[in-house]
Amino acid sequence: EQVAVRMIHAAGMVGLEDHIRFSPGFVPAARAALDSGAPILCDARMVSEGITRPRLPAGNAVVCTLQDAGVPELAAKMGNTRSAAALERWRPHLAGAVVAIGNAPTALFHLLNMLEDPACPRPAAIIGCPVGFVGAMESKDALWADQPGSRAQTPSHFRRARPDSPGQLAPPPIRYFRWLRSP
């Protein structure tokens, strides 16, 4: 409940409460990770700047690798966005971390692709709230469908606005999507 209240306060939207989903065990897993000093990995500086550091229980590191040297070159090599490429820099910190995706759908897609590899370290909790009209719904659906364990998100059917006009944004190239496995 406290998490939802903080989300409502941050967004300034009282009606947000009906549009938040938590997996069973999300809050205890995230709390335990934070209490143990786990880092918080953020996809964008805007997300990291929104974290009130004095409230962190163990002086947790807040990590955003988007501006790191070499990320633009890695993105070009990967054929993906800087947001997705920056997540590759998370690997040494990912085990037991709290992940906060609050900007780029491509970052959430890339995280899910990384987690398909059994050798990839697993975070303790994933918060998936990417924004925008291109890929945000699909990335949240993929998080909810494919990641057992602890996660929270604003669901894919919730948007503050809709691009219903002709000339709305086209879907992203297929390389940004993580297609769900066949049943």
Name each model feature, range by range.
Residues 1-9:
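N-terminal glycine-rich anion-binding loops that anchor highly charged ligand groups
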Residues 18-33:
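A short, well-structured juxtamembrane/interface segment
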Residues 43, 127-128, 167:
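Buried hydrophobic positions in well-ordered alpha/beta secondary-structure cores of metabolic enzymes
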Residues 10-18, 72-73, 125:
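Short, basic, glycine/proline-bearing loop/turn elements
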Residues 134-183:
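C-terminal functional extensions of proteins
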Residues 44-114, 124, 132, 140:
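Conserved mixed alpha/beta catalytic, RNA-binding, or beta-rich assembly cores of soluble enzyme
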Residues 32-36, 90-95, 119-121:
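Flexible, charged surface loops at secondary-structure boundaries
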